[in-house]
C-alpha cells in the first residue's frame, strides 16, 4: 500500500491492523509511546510524516472463532413491534454494582441472572447500549477516565471483551451468545444499539488500527484543500470521522454486521 496522506492513502507497513471482520478481539488497544499512530507526532508535518516503529506489541489481535456454539434450537420470540415493552440497558452497568446480587457482576453472564427481574417488570425486549468491541480514546486515558458507553467501535463483529468473565480468547463470544439464547428462551427480544456512522480511529491525528490502514479512501469521507484534497475527514458525527456509506465495501460490512 501507499502512504500519501494528502491524497488519502494512509497505509503504513509498520502498523499491525485488525481484521474488520474479526469475530473476537483479544486484548485492548494501548497507544503506548504513540505507537498506534502511523505518523511522527514530533515532526512539523504531523500526519503527513511516516512513523516506522512496529505497533504489534500494543495492538490487540483478532481471534478465529468456530461456529460450534450450541444454540439449543434458539429462535427469537418474533414479537410485534406494537407489543414491545423495551428496557434500554447497559450490558455492564445493569449488574456492575454489588447490590445487583449476581455472581458475575458487569458481565454477559451476570445479565442472565437478572432475567427474572426483567420478567417481573413486564419487559419483553431489551435494547442493549453498544456491545461491539470499542477503543478508549487517548485523551480519556490521560485523564484517568474511560469510555463507559462504548460509542467508539473498532470491531463491528466482535462483542466487547471486557464484559466476559474470563480473559481467555473468545470467552466473550460464547458468553454473549449464551446471554442472547437465555433472553430468547425467556421470551425477551434482544435489540442492539449499533454505531456505523463513525469508527474509533478519529480524525487525521487518530490511531491507525484498522480501516484507515486498510483502505482509508474507501472507508471514510475525506476532504481537504487543493494541494491536499483528501487529507482531512468529514466530521458529520462529531467523533472525528464519518464512514463512507456510499462505498461498496462499507455497505457490505454494515449489512454483514447486521446479519
Summary of predicted features, one role per range:
Residues 1-84, 97-100:
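The feature marks proteins involved in alpha-glucan
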Residues 55, 90-109, 113-259:
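Substrate-binding/active-site clefts of carbohydrate-active enzymes
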Residues 87:
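Conserved, well-structured core segments
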Amino acid at each position: 500500500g501507499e502512504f500519501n496522506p494528502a491524497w488519502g492513502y494512509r497505509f503504513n507497513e509498520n502498523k499491525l491492523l485488525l481484521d474488520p471482520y474479526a469475530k473476537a478481539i483479544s486484548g485492548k488497544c494501548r497507544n503506548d509511546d504513540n505507537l498506534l499512530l502511523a505518523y511522527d507526532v514530533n515532526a512539523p508535518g504531523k500526519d503527513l510524516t511516516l512513523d516506522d516503529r512496529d505497533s504489534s506489541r500494543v495492538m490487540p489481535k483478532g481471534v478465529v472463532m468456530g461456529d460450534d456454539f450450541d444454540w439449543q434450537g434458539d429462535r427469537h420470540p418474533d414479537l410485534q413491534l406494537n407489543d414491545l415493552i423495551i428496557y434500554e440497558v447497559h450490558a455492564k452497568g445493569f449488574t456492575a454494582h454489588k447490590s445487583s446480587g449476581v455472581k458475575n457482576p458487569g458481565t454477559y453472564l451476570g445479565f442472565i441472572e437478572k432475567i427474572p427481574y426483567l420478567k417481573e417488570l413486564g419487559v419483553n425486549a431489551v435494547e442493549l447500549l453498544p456491545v461491539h468491541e470499542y477503543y478508549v480514546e487517548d485523551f480519556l486515558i490521560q485523564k484517568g477516565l474511560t469510555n463507559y458507553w462504548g460509542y467508539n467501535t473498532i470491531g463491528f463483529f466482535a462483542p466487547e471483551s471486557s464484559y466476559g468473565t474470563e480473559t481467555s480468547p473468545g470467552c466473550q463470544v460464547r458468553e454473549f451468545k449464551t446471554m442472547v439464547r437465555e433472553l430468547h428462551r425467556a421470551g425477551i427480544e434482544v435489540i442492539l444499539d449499533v454505531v456505523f456512522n463513525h469508527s474509533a480511529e478519529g480524525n487525521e491525528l487518530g490511531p491507525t488500527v484498522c480501516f484507515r490502514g486498510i483502505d482509508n479512501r474507501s472507508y471514510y469521507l475525506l476532504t481537504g484543500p487543493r494541494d491536499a484534497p483528501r487529507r482531512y475527514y468529514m466530521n458529520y458525527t462529531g467523533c472525528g470521522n464519518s464512514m463512507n456509506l456510499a462505498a461498496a465495501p462499507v455497505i457490505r460490512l454494515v449489512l454483514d454486521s447486521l446479519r
